[in-house]
C-alpha cells in the first residue's frame, strides 16, 4: 500500500483476515487518529491505558498515527484523505476520536463516509453499568445489552436534495406523474432505502454475537406498523435469518409461550420484535428483558444514545463500527470543541472503546482488566468534572484520570 504523507511503523505486524477470522499477532500495528476537539485529550489518555493493559498480558500495540478532520485538512487539504482509509483497509482495526460535522451545510459527515467507504455495516454499542457512576434510574445494574445498528442504509444513506434544487423538483414531478403522489414543491427530499441484503447481514451478526456470548435474546426493533415496506421488511427479514440460518439456536417469542410455557430452554435464543417508540419505554421499565438489540440506522442512532443515559451518559459510552474482517472503534460522544485542550473531559468512553477493540481482536483478558480498572477508579471517587458534579469525590483532569486507571489496572 502506498502512502502520501504518513509512513507505517517498521516494527509490528499486520492483523490478517483469513477464512472469516482475524489472525492477530502479539504486536499488531493499529492505526489511530485523534480527530477533532477533545479527541486530542481523550485519545492519548486511552492509549496510555491500552498500552498498560497490553503490557499486562505480554503484548504490545504498535500505533500508527493517521489523520482525519481538521488536522487532515491542514496536512492534505482534505478532511478524509486516502492515506487514512488505506491504513484502515490494510491494518483492519483502527481507534478513532470524535469528528466534527457541521449541521446543515459544509461537508457530509466524515463518520458516515468512513462507514460507507469501508462497508462498516454494523454500529455495535455495548451498554452496561459501571459501579459508582451516577444514573437517573433506580436499578442501573440491570442494564446490560448490546445494540447492533445498521450503518449503511435508511435515511442516513445521504441520498437527499435541498428544497428547490433541480433534483428535488424532478423527483417531486416524477412521483406525481408516475404514481399520483403529491409532495409540496418547497420540500427537501430524502430517500429511505432498507434492503434485504443489508438487513440480513446485520441480524446475522447480531445472532452470531448472541450465540458466541451466551446471550438470551435478540430483539428486532422497527417502526413497521407505519413504514411497512422498509421497517416492516426489516422485521420480516430478521425473522427469516433466525429461522433459516439459526433454526437450531433460535425460537420466537410465540414459540417460547406456545411450546415451552414461557420457560426458555437451555441453549436457545429468543428472537422477538418491538415497535421502536415502545422500545424507548421498554428499556426504562423492563430493562433486564433485553439482551441483544438489532435496529435500522435512524432508530438505532436514537435508541443507542438514549440507552447511554441509563448508565451515566455519552461520556462513558463506547462504540464501534464493524464490517467483515474490519473494525473502526470510536466513542459515542461528539467532539465538544469548547472543551478541547483543557485536560478536563472524561476519557472513559474512549478508554472503554479501546477495551471493546481489544475484545474484538481477541484480547479479552486485557479488555476485562480495563473495564475493572475504570470501575475501581470511579468507585474510589476519582472522577472528572462531569461525574464529580453529581457525586462529589476527587475531581481530576483527563490525564490524571487515565493515570489513576493505569495504577488500578497494574494492581490487578
Curated annotation (Swiss-Prot):
<dbReference type="GO" id="GO:0000287">
    <property type="term" value="F:magnesium ion binding"/>
</dbReference>
<dbReference type="InterPro" id="IPR004439">
    <property type="entry name" value="Isocitrate_DH_NADP_dimer_prok"/>
</dbReference>
<dbReference type="GO" id="GO:0051287">
    <property type="term" value="F:NAD binding"/>
</dbReference>
<protein>
    <recommendedName>
        <fullName>Isocitrate dehydrogenase [NADP]</fullName>
        <ecNumber>1.1.1.42</ecNumber>
    </recommendedName>
</protein>
<feature type="binding site">
    <location>
        <position position="115"/>
    </location>
    <ligand>
        <name>D-threo-isocitrate</name>
    </ligand>
</feature>
<feature type="binding site">
    <location>
        <position position="346"/>
    </location>
    <ligand>
        <name>NADP(+)</name>
    </ligand>
</feature>
<dbReference type="InterPro" id="IPR024084">
    <property type="entry name" value="IsoPropMal-DH-like_dom"/>
</dbReference>
<comment type="similarity">
    <text>Belongs to the isocitrate and isopropylmalate dehydrogenases family.</text>
</comment>
<comment type="subunit">
    <text>Homodimer.</text>
</comment>
<feature type="binding site">
    <location>
        <position position="111"/>
    </location>
    <ligand>
        <name>D-threo-isocitrate</name>
    </ligand>
</feature>
<feature type="site" description="Critical for catalysis">
    <location>
        <position position="223"/>
    </location>
</feature>
<feature type="binding site">
    <location>
        <position position="389"/>
    </location>
    <ligand>
        <name>NADP(+)</name>
    </ligand>
</feature>
<keyword id="KW-0816">Tricarboxylic acid cycle</keyword>
<dbReference type="Pfam" id="PF00180">
    <property type="entry name" value="Iso_dh"/>
</dbReference>
<feature type="binding site">
    <location>
        <position position="149"/>
    </location>
    <ligand>
        <name>D-threo-isocitrate</name>
    </ligand>
</feature>
<comment type="function">
    <text>Catalyzes the oxidative decarboxylation of isocitrate to 2-oxoglutarate and carbon dioxide with the concomitant reduction of NADP(+). NAD(+) can replace NADP(+) with low efficiency.</text>
</comment>
<feature type="binding site">
    <location>
        <begin position="333"/>
        <end position="339"/>
    </location>
    <ligand>
        <name>NADP(+)</name>
    </ligand>
</feature>
<keyword id="KW-0521">NADP</keyword>
<keyword id="KW-0329">Glyoxylate bypass</keyword>
<feature type="binding site">
    <location>
        <position position="301"/>
    </location>
    <ligand>
        <name>Mg(2+)</name>
    </ligand>
</feature>
<feature type="binding site">
    <location>
        <position position="125"/>
    </location>
    <ligand>
        <name>D-threo-isocitrate</name>
    </ligand>
</feature>
<dbReference type="GO" id="GO:0006099">
    <property type="term" value="P:tricarboxylic acid cycle"/>
</dbReference>
<keyword id="KW-0460">Magnesium</keyword>
<keyword id="KW-0464">Manganese</keyword>
<feature type="binding site">
    <location>
        <position position="385"/>
    </location>
    <ligand>
        <name>NADP(+)</name>
    </ligand>
</feature>
<feature type="binding site">
    <location>
        <position position="109"/>
    </location>
    <ligand>
        <name>D-threo-isocitrate</name>
    </ligand>
</feature>
<dbReference type="GO" id="GO:0006097">
    <property type="term" value="P:glyoxylate cycle"/>
</dbReference>
<dbReference type="GO" id="GO:0004450">
    <property type="term" value="F:isocitrate dehydrogenase (NADP+) activity"/>
</dbReference>
<feature type="binding site">
    <location>
        <position position="100"/>
    </location>
    <ligand>
        <name>NADP(+)</name>
    </ligand>
</feature>
<dbReference type="InterPro" id="IPR019818">
    <property type="entry name" value="IsoCit/isopropylmalate_DH_CS"/>
</dbReference>
<keyword id="KW-0560">Oxidoreductase</keyword>
<keyword id="KW-0479">Metal-binding</keyword>
<feature type="site" description="Critical for catalysis">
    <location>
        <position position="156"/>
    </location>
</feature>
Amino acid at each position: 500500500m502506498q502512502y502520501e504523507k504518513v509512513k507505517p511503523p517498521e516494527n509490528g505486524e499486520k492483523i490478517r483476515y483469513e477464512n472469516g477470522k482475524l489472525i492477530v499477532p502479539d504486536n499488531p500495528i493499529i492505526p489511530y487518529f485523534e480527530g477533532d476537539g477533545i479527541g486530542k485529550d481523550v485519545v492519548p489518555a486511552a492509549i496510555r491505558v491500552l498500552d498498560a493493559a497490553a503490557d499486562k498480558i505480554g503484548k504490545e500495540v504498535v500505533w500508527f498515527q493517521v489523520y482525519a478532520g481538521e488536522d487532515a485538512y491542514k496536512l492534505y487539504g482534505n478532511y478524509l484523505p486516502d492515506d487514512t482509509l488505506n491504513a484502515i483497509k490494510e491494518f483492519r482495526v483502527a481507534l478513532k476520536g470524535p469528528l466534527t460535522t457541521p449541521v446543515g451545510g459544509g461537508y457530509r459527515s466524515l463518520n458516515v463516509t468512513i462507514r460507507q467507504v469501508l462497508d462498516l455495516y454494523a454500529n455495535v454499542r455495548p451498554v452496561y453499568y459501571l459501579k459508582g457512576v451516577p444514573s437517573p434510574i433506580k436499578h442501573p445494574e440491570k442494564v446490560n445489552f448490546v445494540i447492533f445498528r445498521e450503518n449503511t442504509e435508511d435515511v442516513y444513506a445521504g441520498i437527499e436534495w435541498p428544497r428547490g434544487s433541480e433534483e428535488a423538483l424532478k423527483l417531486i414531478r416524477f412521483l406525481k406523474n408516475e404514481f399520483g403522489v403529491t409532495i409540496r414543491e418547497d420540500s427537501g427530499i430524502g430517500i429511505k432505502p432498507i434492503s434485504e441484503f443489508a438487513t440480513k447481514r446485520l441480524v446475522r451478526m447480531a445472532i452470531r454475537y448472541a450465540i458466541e456470548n451466551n446471550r438470551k435474546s435478540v430483539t428486532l426493533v422497527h417502526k413497521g406498523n407505519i413504514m411497512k415496506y422498509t421497517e416492516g421488511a426489516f422485521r420480516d427479514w430478521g425473522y427469516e435469518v433466525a429461522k433459516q440460518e439459526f433454526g437450531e439456536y433460535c425460537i420466537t417469542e410465540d414459540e417460547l409461550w406456545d411450546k415451552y410455557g414461557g420457560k426458555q430452554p437451555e441453549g436457545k435464543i429468543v428472537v422477538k420484535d418491538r415497535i421502536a417508540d415502545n422500545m424507548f419505554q421498554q428499556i426504562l421499565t423492563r430493562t433486564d428483558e433485553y439482551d441483544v438489540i438489532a435496529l435500522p440506522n435512524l432508530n438505532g442512532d436514537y435508541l443507542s444514545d438514549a440507552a447511554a443515559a441509563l448508565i451515566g451518559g455519552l461520556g462513558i459510552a463506547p462504540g464501534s463500527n464493524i464490517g467483515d474482517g474490519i473494525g473502526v472503534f470510536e466513542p459515542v460522544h461528539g467532539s465538544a470543541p469548547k472543551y478541547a485542550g483543557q485536560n478536563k473531559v472524561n476519557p472513559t468512553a474512549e478508554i472503554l472503546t479501546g477495551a471493546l477493540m481489544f475484545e474484538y481482536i481477541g484480547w479479552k483478558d486485557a479488555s476485562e482488566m480495563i473495564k475493572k480498572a475504570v470501575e475501581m477508579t470511579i468507585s474510589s471517587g476519582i472522577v472528572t468534572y462531569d461525574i464529580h458534579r453529581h457525586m462529589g469525590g476527587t475531581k481530576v483532569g483527563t490525564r490524571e484520570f487515565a493515570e489513576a486507571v493505569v495504577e488500578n489496572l497494574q494492581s490487578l
